[in-house]
């Protein structure tokens, strides 16, 4: 039987008009939280990076709030076999 570990990559877009900020945060299987924004400016860049580390995307979800400005939160759920 295969045992898995799980992680979460969160992309947050916050903006109003021409001003916006995009950040990426990695929630590791050990409970750690790390800002990984400097590793790339697109979700694809981040997913390819962790894919090379053995992570597989298993689900994605998006929340959008346009009440005051614009906020988008994308959650990428990943897994990989425990070694």
Regions found by a protein language model. Name each.
Residues 1-83:
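Terminus-proximal functional modules
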